Amino acid sequence: MILVIEIGGTKLQLGVFDPSRSVLVHCERLKVCRTAGAQGILNQIESALPSVLKGLDVERCGIGFGGPIHEDGSVLKSHQVTGWDCFPLAAWVREKTGLPTHVANDCDAAALAEARYGAGVNLTSMFYVTVGTGIGGGLIRHGQRQGTDRPAIAEIGHLRPGLLSNLATDTVESYASGQGIAQQVHLLALEVGRWLQTGQVTWEQLPAFGQLQIPIPTMDQIQVSDDWYRSLESDKLTTEHVAAAAHEGIWLAKTPLQLATTTLGWAIAQMATLVAPQRIVIGGGVSKMGDTLFWQPLRNSFAKYVFGPLRDPSLLVPSLLGDDVVLYGAAAIAMPPQA
């Protein structure tokens, strides 16, 4: 049996994986309190370990972590939660459990999971993208993770979307992740307020939206958008709120989603043009928005920007392992490499 742990930006999962049956036999899901930082998450793990391990013959541990990882299993940093810089995560878990412990970036782990157990089975190459709180990627060739000797690889979320993106914070993740979509809604809401005050509607303050050639909204659309935004607790805005409003046709919700899927499709097209994977598997909470809001516009954007001979939108498929993908990946990295 294998102790498996996922440490993300908003969730924490611990479970036990049975490699003889390739199934999770136990799983506990916890919410991450970001304000408590890394120490808060470590406290949660330590508190949960006794109940997770009780009565089970566990021999090793695998961890998928939301950030770049050193070869020795220590954390380089987290882009979501403070306090992780240079933390010896593998050594800490070994000390608490006595188990041989392996740590990988969560997207690399998820990519390996889909290749072994999910949508990438029997393929020689596969690229995995997670679109959740952040955006990450993992590349698998011949059943093996690529870049294991490097602190990061296939970090599609940290691509700069175009030559005019001069700020380090101006990334694919800043437009297309769950956090990024919410932030773009907030920025666009500020513009909506200005438009209502001045009666002048321009994209001067938000050039990324202007580059999409989105038609100027009517004053009725602007007013409905402003009313919707004011009805929310803005500090608790989620992609679920945005998706629900977009389905209702609210312009302020639909427009950032258009920016998100266009930007992400562009980024996936760049990766596909460079490495030509047989399949591109996409997971994470944002990918659950459905065909109309996510998959159809994403595939359209991918087809627009990818190199012609690789223009096959059917290459983009959803994850088969869903919310458990990183736990399956944590198990895979803890097992001996496959021949």
Residue map of PLM features:
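ATP-binding/phosphotransfer module of carbohydrate and carboxylate kinases, centering on a glycine-rich
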Residues: 1-60, 70-72, 91-99, 113-125, ...
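A charged helix-plus-loop insertion that forms the helical arch/lid used to bind
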Residues: 74-85
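Conserved A3 ("GATE") glycine/threonine-rich loop of ANL adenylate-forming enzymes
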Residues: 10-11, 107-109, 133-136
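General beta-strand structural signal in soluble alpha/beta enzymes
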Residues: 101-105
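Short beta-strand segments
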Residues: 6, 62-66, 128-134, 138
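A conserved active-site-flanking secondary-structure segment within enzyme catalytic domains
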Residues: 146-162
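Adenylate-forming
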Residues: 110-116, 137-139, 158-160
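A short acidic/small-residue loop/turn micro-motif
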Residues: 31-33, 83-84, 152-155
